Amino acid sequence: MFKKLLLALVFSAGTFLWSVSSFADGHCEGSTMNDGHTGGKYPQQYELSEYQSAAGCKMVFAENPNIVSINDTIQGNKGLAAVADRLPDEPLVVVPYDSIGSYGGTIKFLSNATEAGTSDMLSTRHVNLLRFADDLTTIVPNVAKDYEWNSDFTTLTFTLRKGHKWSNGEPFTARDVEFWYEDLMMNPKIREKPYPYLLVGGEPMTVDVIDDVTVRFNLPSPFPGLTATIAWSYNQFFMPAHFLEQFHPEIDSNA
């Protein structure tokens, strides 16, 4: 069951974005980089309100026409709610280069390390709080809405998206980040030793929940490379606390 709990991120279960303007016919086509919409605070992406202001359009949402039948093939999945109910209150808008893609077709790809049981392509199915932009240099928000360092790179604060949900409809909150780090990754009963990339100078960080949509990493020493670690890591920096806490004996006495 746990493996079915996915984070309903930007396009939520096959959702994509179209823009709707005040033109006489009520519609305008989706924008691309060629239309001059190159990004807001971060390259090639906007917050919804930011995009609507820049493009002079109001967005409406559509979905993969086959998503309901695909969802029904997974045993135990609930029926899908309406598109608007699946999206967070603050969805991310990613601007395509040339056109909005079409559903269907076959993708072919090469893998450099199949003998290691990994797949270059399949590894991209996971999303994290941050990601690298297409220039492979700029680090931009992904699951997170925004992030900010303090002046000496010892605290990293994430702002999450209001109304963000897991695939079962439960809220995705700062507690999911704290639970992942403090209760799972730093728990010696679960991992004898923490992963080196989760330490700074060999010392653990701490994670504080400021409110439901604000979470802060406190570092024992300056480490500006943490954002790059989060952006490239295959391992997600959050777990569904609402589901996993029932199996954690230090949290639930019935576990």
Predicted segments with their positions:
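Extracytoplasmic/secreted proteins, especially bacterial periplasmic and envelope-associated proteins
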Residues: 65, 69, 124, 142, ...
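Surface-exposed binding/hinge segments that line
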Residues: 196-255
